[in-house]
Amino acid sequence: MSRADELYRQTCIDILENGFSDEGLEVRPHWADGIPAHTIKKFGVVNRYNLAEEFPIMTLRRTYWKSAIDELLWIWQKKSNRVCDLGSHVWDEWAGEDGTIGKAYGYQLGVKYQFNQGQEPMDQVDRVLYDLKHNPASRRILTNIYNFQDLHEMNLYPCAYSMTFNVTGNKLNAILNQRSQDMLTANNWNVVQYAALTHMMAQVSGLEVGEFVHVIADCHIYDRHIPAVKAMLEKDGFEAPKFVMDKSVDDFYAFTKDSFKMENYKFHEFKFDIPMAI
């Protein structure tokens, strides 16, 4: 089984056996039928992935990795908040009448700031790219899209909100901070996205990949997802596939979802419909 499978299994078992249930409490999320969507949660989950050893994609069920990377590029490369710029319909329900998700996610990464006196303003992504090449020893290479000033104009508050990059020797390490994580629908989706981002940032900066650390504040399983999660945990996973990235790309903005391959990706069938809490 892949390392991603192992950590997913450990996290889910810990939540189910030792987590806190908010059943009976007033909660914001609800199901499509109007019934409150309750969870079992653990606080402060930290999972570490050595990207130099294997790519962290799960095999207990299929992760649609190409769609996940397409979404990441929508946020980090296009810096867009328009759902029509995305190749899937994942975000359609959060789009307003103007076809955007408000000042969330990609919008925040596209805002330009005056970082240093005398330098031209640049956005957060370009600042990361600049520092990785020119200031790799810096401890300030990070992004943060949880902008309190704009929260009232976001159709969805950012869940994965901050990336910190750290260069150790010739290796690029990264930490993703996430305030909330739905384990069934989004955990490995997010892990795949930001592991791929770390690979991209490393390649265009002339670095090797190191460790990807995923820090989750509220890590939860929804009540109606529990049967599906338990069924997944009964399976034995497969070995991780081989992650292949186009080595000729040296410009972050030149990557596309077709710049990647997942060779020999084996996964178990998943026969459950997944209701979405909103």
Could you say what each language-model-derived stretch is?
Residues M1-I278:
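Terminal, non-catalytic protein-protein interaction segments that mediate quaternary/complex assembly
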